[in-house]
């Protein structure tokens, strides 16, 4: 049986920790002038993948 291959785009976007999967925040690429500084600071922080999406992400990462 051949090796399982992960989705390369997903492998670049997600980091796997002990029990959770980390992801970066969205809404940070363009049209940034109208967004407040506090929101921009908050968006810099990484977040965890929601429980509804964990199984799909794990399947993409072959976990």
Swiss-Prot record:
<dbReference type="InterPro" id="IPR037229">
    <property type="entry name" value="Ribosomal_bL35_sf"/>
</dbReference>
<dbReference type="GO" id="GO:0022625">
    <property type="term" value="C:cytosolic large ribosomal subunit"/>
</dbReference>
<dbReference type="InterPro" id="IPR001706">
    <property type="entry name" value="Ribosomal_bL35"/>
</dbReference>
<dbReference type="InterPro" id="IPR021137">
    <property type="entry name" value="Ribosomal_bL35-like"/>
</dbReference>
<keyword id="KW-0689">Ribosomal protein</keyword>
<dbReference type="InterPro" id="IPR018265">
    <property type="entry name" value="Ribosomal_bL35_CS"/>
</dbReference>
<protein>
    <recommendedName>
        <fullName>Large ribosomal subunit protein bL35</fullName>
    </recommendedName>
</protein>
<comment type="similarity">
    <text>Belongs to the bacterial ribosomal protein bL35 family.</text>
</comment>
<dbReference type="GO" id="GO:0003735">
    <property type="term" value="F:structural constituent of ribosome"/>
</dbReference>
<dbReference type="GO" id="GO:0006412">
    <property type="term" value="P:translation"/>
</dbReference>
<keyword id="KW-0687">Ribonucleoprotein</keyword>
<dbReference type="Pfam" id="PF01632">
    <property type="entry name" value="Ribosomal_L35p"/>
</dbReference>
